[in-house]
Amino acid sequence: MAFTPFPPRQPTASARLPLTLMTLDDWALATITGADSEKYMQGQVTADVSQMTEDQHLLAAHCDAKGKMWSNLRLFRDGDGFAWIERRSVREPQLTELKKYAVFSKVTIAPDDERVLLGVAGFQARAALANLFSVLPSKEKQVIREDATTLLWFEHPAERFLIVTDEATANMLTDKLRGEAELNNSQQWLALNIEAGFPVIDAANSGQFIPQATNLQALGGISFKKGCYTGQEMVARAKFRGANKRALWLLTGSASRLPEAGEDLELKMGENWRRTGTVLAAVKLEDGQVVVQVVMNNDMEPDSIFRVRDDANTLHIEPLPYSLEE
């Protein structure tokens, strides 16, 4: 039987999150295997994959020739190649683009729906998992493999773990944690990624932004020293010529409805409102607060006031857990 996603509950901010086990059904896994895997990925993504160790995972972008991202990928070494996690809505088109040059290389690129993606976060997440695995990942060793399972460690917004495993292990983990952990779906993991300032690229925003417009340079996702990759010229120009005028921002506040990916917001200008930005993702938390991830000009005043279009409620800027200073 296929592993069934958990029913949804309103997400909670990291500071108040009880121990929670999540099914990450809005994310999807893909792999590249074969003798040329590393060389092939090195020519396709913004990160320097040749420098990646077995202990690392990182956020990289896969761009078109103009430097616009098809998707961003949470990348790690897997078997004799690599695996990555991205939003399910962009996986198929992203893989189609990635395969375009594969005919000339010894690689196999494929979606992986055999394995299950789970998230564990919240109060004493590490202690709960320590009973189930012999070793857990940490800041020094961010990827751990045990039998059929790969565990990825995340620091922000609070310590959490992403588990890539087979169906049998996923069922075992669910049975073991069911008594002490709340069960939730992808929306809770999405809320944590928004809070952490990790850009969320869904289908509506695929092919729209260069990596720096979503803060990827601040998240260690772009190497400016590696050799050629698709879109490199535009990505480099944005850095060295200051061509990038946008950044990813975190907004919180109230709204009578959740803005959708690809939608704009409105910025208060005196007595008027002016349309601005592009929403990447938004969630409503259990306390009623709305959290929005949006790409806007990178020179916004910190006390700016925003709203969902024509809404009576307002949103304001929250600091991200990393610096954009280069």
Swiss-Prot record:
InterPro entries this protein is in? GCV_T_N, GcvT/YgfZ_C, tRNA-modifying_YgfZ, YgfZ/GcvT, YgfZ/GcvT_CS, YgfZ_barrel
The record's listing under SUPFAM superfamilies reads: Aminomethyltransferase beta-barrel domain (SSF101790), Folate-binding domain (SSF103025)
For the keyword tRNA processing, the answer is: yes
User: What biological processes does GO assign it?
Assistant: iron-sulfur cluster assembly; RNA modification; tRNA processing
Specify whether tRNA processing is a keyword of the entry: yes
Superkingdom, according to UniProt?
Answer: Bacteria
A GO MF label:
folic acid binding
Positions bound to folate: 27, 189
Task: Quote any Pfam family the record assigns.
Answer: YgfZ_barrel
Sorted alphabetically, the keyword list is: Cytoplasm, Folate-binding, tRNA processing
Gene Ontology CC annotations of this record: cytoplasm
Report the subcellular localization. Answer: Cytoplasm
Mainly resides where?
A: cytoplasm
Q: What is stated as this protein's family in its record?
A: Belongs to the tRNA-modifying YgfZ family.
Instruction: Write out the function statement from the record.
Output: Folate-binding protein involved in regulating the level of ATP-DnaA and in the modification of some tRNAs. It is probably a key factor in regulatory networks that act via tRNA modification, such as initiation of chromosomal replication.
Q: What is this protein called?
A: tRNA-modifying protein YgfZ
The species is Escherichia coli (strain ATCC 8739 / DSM 1576 / NBRC 3972 / NCIMB 8545 / WDCM 00012 / Crooks)
